[in-house]
């Protein structure tokens, strides 16, 4: 499904919240949307890895990763992005960095993040799954919906359909 966030904003002005503009599109999909699953972690992508490796777990879903806005290492690389695409994830919104951007740009996955960084994270198994996370002026709730394209990122408490 192709989403156009300005059209969704126009059609559902009372339903949506707009995330502050800070993300860049790195993925192979121009737009993505789906039900939110959250991970809260800081410079440790163990839970990200765990989520994307679950077969079929991501069907129709978007993984929202609150990495604390860290610009010191990458929470996503090419291998995890490819696993996420194979597991059916629609996309990932990462409040932090990614790496392997040239490969991720060719992967059938929506990916938006703050920046790229060549260093990988530590793997300490520290983080929280499906908790409320807040960044970009909004609170992301597991089970709600996220839609993203090159215009920006929006969230909604219920699924949205593109207007005719």
From Swiss-Prot:
It is an enzyme of class 4 (lyase). The keyword Kinase does not apply. It comes from the Bacteria. Its cofactor is a divalent metal cation. A divalent metal cation binds at residue 100. GO terms for molecular function: 4-hydroxy-4-methyl-2-oxoglutarate aldolase activity; metal ion binding; oxaloacetate decarboxylase activity; ribonuclease inhibitor activity. One of its GO terms (biological process) is regulation of RNA metabolic process. Its EC number is 4.1.3.17, 4.1.1.112. Divalent metal cation. It catalyses: 4-hydroxy-4-methyl-2-oxoglutarate = 2 pyruvate; oxaloacetate + H(+) = pyruvate + CO2. Keywords: Lyase, Metal-binding. Substrate binds at residues 77-80, 99. Catalyzes the aldol cleavage of 4-hydroxy-4-methyl-2-oxoglutarate (HMG) into 2 molecules of pyruvate. Also contains a secondary oxaloacetate (OAA) decarboxylase activity due to the common pyruvate enolate transition state formed following C-C bond cleavage in the retro-aldol and decarboxylation reactions. PANTHER family: 4-HYDROXY-4-METHYL-2-OXOGLUTARATE ALDOLASE 3-RELATED, REGULATOR OF RIBONUCLEASE ACTIVITY A. Homotrimer. Belongs to the class II aldolase/RraA-like family. This is Putative 4-hydroxy-4-methyl-2-oxoglutarate aldolase. It comes from Pseudomonas savastanoi pv. phaseolicola (strain 1448A / Race 6).
């Amino acid at each position: 499904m192709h989403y156009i966030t300005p059209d969704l904003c126009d059609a559902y002005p009372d339903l949506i919240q707009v995330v502050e503009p800070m993300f860049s599109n790195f993925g192979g999909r121009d737009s993505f949307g789906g039900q939110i699953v959250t991970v809260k972690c800081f410079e440790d992508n163990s839970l990200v890895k765990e989520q994307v490796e679950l077969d079929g777990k991501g069907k129709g879903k978007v993984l929202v990763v609150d990495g604390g806005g860290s610009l010191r290492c990458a929470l996503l690389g090419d291998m995890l992005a490819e696993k996420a695409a194979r597991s059916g994830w629609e996309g990932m919104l990462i409040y932090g960095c990614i790496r392997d951007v040239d490969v991720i740009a060719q992967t059938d996955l929506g990916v938006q993040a703050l920046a790229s960084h060549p260093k990988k994270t530590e793997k300490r198994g520290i983080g929280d799954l499906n908790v409320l996370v807040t960044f970009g002026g909004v609170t992301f709730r597991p089970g709600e919906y996220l839609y993203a394209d090159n215009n920006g990122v929006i969230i909604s408490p219920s699924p949205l359909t593109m207007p005719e």
